[in-house]
């Protein structure tokens, strides 16, 4: 194919050369030119033949290489396939041998199973015969026992079951009692250890709160400027703040009196600013009081944020933080509620760590437990209920809401967290020195405790001790039995809960003693 193509190319080249030569002959008639052209044409034809032969040889060699390569590839592929087929044949042969072995094994097992089945059938037949014989013997013995005892089998079975049931109940009762006593002793010991550890690890600073504030004056002349002409300045200040200003003979001091600590703080800041500024008149007073109110609001917000930061509690709603800051200006039996909440939170966290429960959640519940005390008196309800509603409103979890609601038994505690908050609240409020009350209130509370205890029949005397946190009731052994002492203690506790208001809890101890006297003469 390639040789024919080269021949055609040479023919075309020769025709072209002839055409050129013809043109050349027509244009030039000179013999020399014709001879030169013929010679040139002959050379070109010769060169073309040589090139054609070279190309033909190269094409032949390439064709041989292609054929050789194709043959080599075919032989290699054939060899690979033959090797794969041999390997496959070997695997199939091995599988066939394995299948033969398994078939032989299955045949052996089948024979063994058949043999066992025949043996079991024979044993079953023997056991059936023995069972029939045993049932016959049992029936005969039952009849003989019924004749001897005069009871049927059902009656004897009933008596036996009742006896076993009574014994089981008695053993179970003893076991339950032992477990309860052990659990009570262990729980009491463990709870005391945890509370003692919590108290030792936390020692918060505390300063008793009062219902008055004192503002120092640079001189007694300032008192006249504070009062103003015809008392207009002092009236304007009292009207703007809602706090009474007491200006008496106390040197270089003005007393601010009021039960609302927030207003008292506003009045104190306002008066200090007015004294420092020197301009004291009704217009200036209103302006300064407005600025002081803004400063107190900002201080409350910062106090709430600082409390959350100190405890490591995050994600609290800004409104709740503001209410926590407001607790800084609330007191309970002269104990600052803000400091009390921080103390309860720290105690909750310590006890939660000892018990292995969520420390962050315990601190959060402790911090928010008295949230309801930050709300003014316009909102009705106990502070626990109000606090729980606020916590729920601002997205606190149900566990936190329940702990707030249950810390004063407005709801029965149902979680360990709620009981922890109760315990920490009692620890913070009931420790000596945490709370103060007026002497008259204190004495009246002791008298009421002793009066309630003595109002019950059979009580000979009562003594309020431990600052009114415990009462010992002496009873007549002739009128009150040992069994009645527990009932009497519960009745006294119930009456105290109904008729009295008190912080923490009160322990009632009923003491009954029998004295035998004889004289040796």
Swiss-Prot record:
GO terms for biological process: mRNA catabolic process. Its main location: membrane. Residues 337-430 form the HD domain. GO terms for molecular function: RNA binding; RNA endonuclease activity. Residues 211-271 form the KH domain. It is a single-pass membrane protein. Its EC number is 3.1.-.-. The chain crosses the membrane at residues 5-25. CDD domains: HDc, KH-I_RNaseY. Pfam families: HD, KH_1, RNase_Y_N. It is an enzyme of class 3 (hydrolase). Endoribonuclease that initiates mRNA decay. HAMAP family: RNase_Y. This is Ribonuclease Y. It comes from Geotalea uraniireducens (strain Rf4) (Geobacter uraniireducens). The gene is rny.
């Amino acid at each position: 194919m390639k040789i024919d193509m080269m021949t055609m190319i040479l023919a075309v080249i020769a025709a072209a050369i002839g055409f050129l030569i013809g043109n050349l002959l027509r244009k030039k008639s000179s013999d020399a030119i014709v001879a030169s052209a013929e010679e040139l044409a002959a050379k070109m034809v010769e060169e073309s033949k040589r090139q054609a032969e070279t190309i033909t040889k190269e094409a032949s060699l390439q064709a041989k290489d292609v054929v050789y390569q194709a043959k080599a590839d075919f032989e290699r592929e054939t060899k690979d396939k033959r090797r794969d087929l041999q390997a496959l044949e070997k695997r199939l042969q091995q599988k066939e041998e394995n299948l033969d072995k398994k078939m032989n094994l299955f045949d052996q097992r089948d024979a063994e199973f058949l043999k066992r089945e025949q043996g079991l059938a024979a044993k079953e037949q023997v056991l059936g015969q023995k069972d029939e014989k045993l049932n016959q013997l049992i029936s005969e013995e039952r009849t003989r026992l019924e004749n001897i005892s005069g009871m049927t089998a059902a009656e004897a079975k009933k008596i036996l079951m009742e006896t076993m049931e009574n014994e089981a109940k008695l053993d179970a009762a003893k076991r339950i009692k032992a477990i309860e006593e052990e659990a009570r002793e262990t729980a009491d010991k463990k709870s005391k250890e945890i509370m003692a550890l919590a108290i030792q690890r936390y020692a918060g600073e505390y300063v008793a709160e009062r219902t008055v504030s004192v503002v120092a004056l640079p001189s007694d002349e300032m008192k006249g400027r504070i009062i103003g002409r015809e008392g207009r300045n002092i009236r304007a200040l009292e009207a703007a703040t809602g706090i009474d200003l007491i200006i008496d003979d106390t040197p270089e001091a003005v007393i601010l009196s009021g039960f609302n600590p927030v207003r008292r703080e506003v009045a104190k800041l306002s008066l200090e600013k007015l004294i420092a500024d020197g301009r004291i008149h009704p217009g200036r007073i209103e302006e300064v009081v407005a600025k002081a109110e803004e400063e107190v609001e900002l201080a409350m917000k910062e106090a709430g944020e600082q409390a959350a930061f100190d405890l490591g509690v995050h994600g609290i709603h800004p409104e709740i933080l503001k209410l926590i800051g407001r607790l800084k200006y609330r007191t309970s039996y002269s104990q600052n509620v803000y400091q009390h909440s921080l103390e309860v939170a720290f105690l909750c966290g310590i006890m939660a760590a000892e018990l292995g429960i969520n420390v962050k959640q315990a601190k959060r519940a402790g911090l928010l437990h008295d949230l309801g005390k930050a709300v003014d008196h316009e909102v009705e309800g106990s502070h626990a209920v109000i606090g729980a509603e606020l916590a729920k409103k601002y997205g606190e979890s149900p566990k936190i809401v329940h702990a707030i609601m249950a810390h004063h038994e407005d709801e029965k505690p149902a979680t360990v967290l709620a009981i922890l908050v109760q315990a920490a609240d009692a620890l913070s409020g009931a420790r000596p020195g945490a709370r103060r009350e007026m002497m008259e209130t204190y004495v009246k509370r002791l008298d009421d405790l002793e009066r309630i205890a003595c109002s019950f029949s059979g009580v000979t005397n009562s003594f309020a001790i431990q600052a009114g946190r415990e009462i010992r009731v002496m009873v007549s052994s002739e009128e009150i039995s040992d069994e009645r002492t527990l009932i009497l203690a519960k009745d006294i506790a119930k009456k105290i809960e109904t008729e009295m208001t008190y912080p923490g809890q009160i322990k009632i101890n009923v003491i009954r003693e029998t004295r035998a006297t004889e004289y040796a003469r």
